[in-house]
């Protein structure tokens, strides 16, 4: 069964605060966004492991300031879609939740902020330069990613030039170990640290002092919030030399499912509410820092 997306009262906040942040986004990012729109590659869509023919909105070709940029990546060798060697053609690990979660979140960014957001996502291949046209980049299930040396170098350059990376939906000690092995190649001399509760990213739009573990759809059947041995959620990140958060690492949670299943009446609404609030803050932070 489906439910309507979260209503406006679910995310109520002072209008003045929205307008101040929106003005900051325009002043900080407006000129750069105009240049980026001119160079963005055309929209492209791939078959996903959960959705193969997702309907397109009418305005899917419109240029915009912000686009949900989803990282395409090769994964560790393995059976099925996880180890698909033809990952550039879709039906691979990077397409988990895609494109439903991307478009549901894009709708909320449009509704809750003054950021001009496109209604559809853009898959990003680090083997070309399109990544530099997008200030915010998301990756799912990074406990399985397996970036090449060339992709690692491009990824590092993107972050140091002002890009923001958010990753999500990986669980337990084994997936964490593999994720950090890759990130240590991206930044050999930068530590992954816990994001302090007073960091701007937790307060730029919504005050997120009362965060909790957001589970995936499996909660509907299992009634447990964790997966594998990931019993507690972790909010970690990597900062640049000026104190800007470059990478927000959401470990032992599944925010992507909270966006994807925003219209699923069986999925608890409180998970979608928090998942959306976190994403709105992260996107706004990326656009204003």
Give the residues covered by each predicted segment.
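An acidic, glycine-rich "communication" segment
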Residues: 39-52, 76, 80-83, 174-256, ...
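Bacterial N-terminal signal peptides that target proteins for export
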Residues: 2-22
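Extracytoplasmic/secreted envelope proteins and their assembly/folding machinery
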Residues: 102-106, 152, 156, 176-180, ...
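Aromatic-Pro/Gly-enriched surface loop or interdomain linker
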Residues: 37-136, 142-143, 246, 254-289
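Surface-exposed patches in mature extracellular/periplasmic domains of secreted proteins
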Residues: 115-125, 167-172, 190-198
């Amino acid at each position: 069964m489906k439910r309507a997306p979260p209503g406006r009262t679910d995310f109520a906040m002072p209008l003045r605060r929205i307008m101040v942040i929106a003005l900051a986004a325009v002043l900080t990012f407006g000129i750069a966004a105009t240049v980026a729109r001119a160079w963005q590659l055309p929209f492209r869509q791939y078959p996903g492991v959960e959705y193969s023919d997702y309907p397109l909105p009418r305005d899917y070709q419109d240029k915009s300031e912000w686009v949900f940029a989803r990282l395409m990546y090769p994964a560790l060798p393995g059976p099925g879609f996880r180890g698909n060697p033809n990952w550039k053609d879709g039906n691979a690990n990077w397409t988990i939740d895609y494109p439903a979660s991307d478009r549901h979140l894009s709708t909320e960014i449009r509704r809750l902020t003054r950021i001009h957001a496109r209604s559809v996502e853009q898959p990003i291949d680090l083997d070309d330069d399109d990544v530099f046209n997008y200030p915010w980049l998301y990756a799912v299930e990074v406990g399985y990613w397996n970036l090449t040396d060339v992709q690692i170098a491009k990824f590092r350059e993107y972050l140091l030039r002002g890009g923001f990376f958010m990753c999500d939906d990986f669980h337990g000690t084994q997936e964490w170990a593999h994720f950090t092995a890759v990130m240590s190649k991206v930044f050999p001399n930068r530590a992954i640290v816990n994001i302090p509760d007073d960091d701007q990213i937790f307060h730029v739009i919504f005050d997120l002092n009362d965060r909790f573990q957001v589970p995936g759809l499996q909660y509907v059947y299992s009634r447990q919030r964790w997966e594998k041995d990931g019993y507690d959620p972790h909010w970690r990140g990597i900062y640049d030399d000026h104190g800007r958060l470059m990478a927000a690492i959401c470990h032992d949670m599944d925010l992507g499912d909270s966006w994807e299943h925003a219209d699923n009446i069986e999925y608890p609404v409180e998970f979608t509410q928090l998942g959306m609030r976190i994403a709105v803050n992260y996107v706004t932070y990326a656009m204003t820092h």
